[in-house]
């Protein structure tokens, strides 16, 4: 977990928590790979919430992906910059089975895909997997599709990782939200922001702004995460 740049490691067995790394700017998403190394995104060069939302009012290419390597001596003292010049780097997913890394570039309305060499921590061959409104957190489903939250559309979208085809798997979009989404997409294409569009009229009956999901296997329900005070449980059809 993380809090304004601090990344924590929590042991449920030992009931203990330690700070793994304190980043200068805010950390968005952190994931561990099979080598024990820690990857994390920096959405923008923010040291407070006001600056964070400033990067949602204007497209700024100061997002990045970092990797904190791990060895038998523990974590490195400083992370390696893997990818920079991203427009609000958000959620990402490490797919070691396919040697791919997927990443949400929110202020470009796109999901990127890279070839991954997990042993060296290197990425190559950046391409755009899919175009979608404001991609946020993501998870790989039990069927092998990439589920991505879209706050601006108030939906969860599923991306076929082979073709890039996008379908809606959870939809809480309102009529006003649909119009706000169209406005936001146009603004982002012009290098502008959409923070002022994140209103109660957009979120509708959701407890808060839709930002992610928790997935189980094919027989289990999934949960929709948001910035409110409740998870939404959804039974799979």
Residue ranges and their predicted role:
Residues 2-4, 43-45, 106, 116, ...:
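Short loop/turn segments immediately following the C-termini of beta-strands
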């Amino acid at each position: 977990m993380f809090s304004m740049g601090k990344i924590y490691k929590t042991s449920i067995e030992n009931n203990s928590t330690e700070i793994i790394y304190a980043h200068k700017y805010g950390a968005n998403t952190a994931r561990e790979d099979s080598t024990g190394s820690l990857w994390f995104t920096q959405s923008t060069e923010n040291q407070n919430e006001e600056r964070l939302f400033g990067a949602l009012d204007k497209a700024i290419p100061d997002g990045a992906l970092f990797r904190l390597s791990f060895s038998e001596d523990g974590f490195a003292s400083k992370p390696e910059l893997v990818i920079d010049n991203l427009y609000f780097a958000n959620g990402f997913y490490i797919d070691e089975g396919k040697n791919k890394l997927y990443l949400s570039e929110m202020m470009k309305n796109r999901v990127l895909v890279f070839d991954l060499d997990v042993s060296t921590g290197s990425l190559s061959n950046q391409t755009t997997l899919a175009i979608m409104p404001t991609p946020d957190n993501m998870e790989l489903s039990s069927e092998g599709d990439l589920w991505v939250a879209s706050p601006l559309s108030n939906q969860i979208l599923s991306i076929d990782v082979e073709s890039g085809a996008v379908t809606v798997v959870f939809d809480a979009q309102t009529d006003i939200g649909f119009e706000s989404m169209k406005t936001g997409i146009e603004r982002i294409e012009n290098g502008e922001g959409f923070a002022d569009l994140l209103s109660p009229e957009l979120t509708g009956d959701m407890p808060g702004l839709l930002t992610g999901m928790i997935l189980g296997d094919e027989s289990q329900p999934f949960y929709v995460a948001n910035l409110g005070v409740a998870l939404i449980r959804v039974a799979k059809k």
